[in-house]
């Protein structure tokens, strides 16, 4: 579903990439380049929503957020076999079980269960929606109903 590797820091690559991200092979640059293009440097809070196909992208976005002293959080719909990946990568993202027949449903339910004070802290974040098109569409509709502006939502389908 996704490729995990052990990145090693390299100061020359960091300078070339212009950010404090780990060195990566040419094949691994895609999520890093994508993350740099998507990242909203104007906001300090970044919220990720997706499935297991988005772990590499969200890991790259995490690196940019931490480099800029920004906050990030999110929720991923995952098959239970992939939950260990989040802790391996030290991603501060919650996971909910995937429902192949209803992508996005469990992530939306997770948001609905969020404490109102927590929502107040994150409602002005930039939201990164990635993964299956149905998940993205459903979650975008949910955010718009919660009065999140379209300008705050960035979508990446796989």
What are these model-predicted stretches?
Residues 1-158:
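Extended, composition-driven regions rather than compact fold-specific motifs
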């Amino acid at each position: 579903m996704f490729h995990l590797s052990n990145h090693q820091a390299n100061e020359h690559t960091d300078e070339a990439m212009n950010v404090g991200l780990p060195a990566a092979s040419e094949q691994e640059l895609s999520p890093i380049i994508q993350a740099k293009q998507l990242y909203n440097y104007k906001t300090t809070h970044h919220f990720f929503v997706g499935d297991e196909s988005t772990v590499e992208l969200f890991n790259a976005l995490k690196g940019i957020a931490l480099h800029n002293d920004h906050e990030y959080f999110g929720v991923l719909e995952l098959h239970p076999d992939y939950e260990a990946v989040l802790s391996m990568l030290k991603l501060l993202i919650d996971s909910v079980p995937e429902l192949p027949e209803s992508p996005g449903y469990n992530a939306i339910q997770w948001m609905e269960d969020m404490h109102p004070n927590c929502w107040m802290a994150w409602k002005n974040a930039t939201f990164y929606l990635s993964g299956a098109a149905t998940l993205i569409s459903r979650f975008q509709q949910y955010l718009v109903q919660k009065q999140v502006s379209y300008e705050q939502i960035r979508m990446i389908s796989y």
